[in-house]
């Protein structure tokens, strides 16, 4: 992993189990869920909702989570760094009903819109959204 550079969240399946890991800066999200007896990984919480899984937690920046026989082990192979999550997770990549870093994507988008309206008010009759873009 120390040879990898850039933003990533990885999920690997081996003969022994699953491995989920996130880049040391936490640019890309990765979450852990439980579906019946299985531990699952996803890039956003809404994927857990779609399959009926229960959200357990987010994988921390630089953390590697190993799942064997239904048990999770956490390894932190990197020195702790100041996280730098990508703002595009909130404004573009994630679905509005997802939770990223403990915050509702919808609420972040709404707050950004309110800030934009306060900074640059315009005379308008209607706002046209671009759903799920």
Show which residues each predicted segment covers:
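N-terminal segments that mediate ammonia production and transfer
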Residues: 1-133
């Amino acid at each position: 992993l120390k040879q990898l550079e850039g933003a990533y969240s990885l999920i690997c399946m081996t003969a022994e189990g699953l491995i989920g890991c996130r880049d040391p800066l936490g640019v890309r999200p990765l979450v852990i869920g439980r579906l019946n007896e299985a531990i699952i990984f996803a890039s956003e919480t809404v994927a857990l909702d779609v399959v009926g899984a229960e959200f357990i937690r987010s994988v921390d920046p630089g953390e590697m989570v190993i799942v064997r026989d239904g048990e999770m082990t956490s390894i932190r192979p990197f020195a702790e760094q100041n996280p730098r999550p990508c703002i595009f997770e909130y404004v573009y990549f994630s679905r509005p009903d997802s939770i990223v870093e403990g915050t509702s994507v919808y609420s972040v988008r709404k707050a950004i819109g309110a800030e934009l309206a306060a900074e640059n008010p315009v005379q308008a009759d209607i706002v046209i959204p671009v759903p799920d873009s």
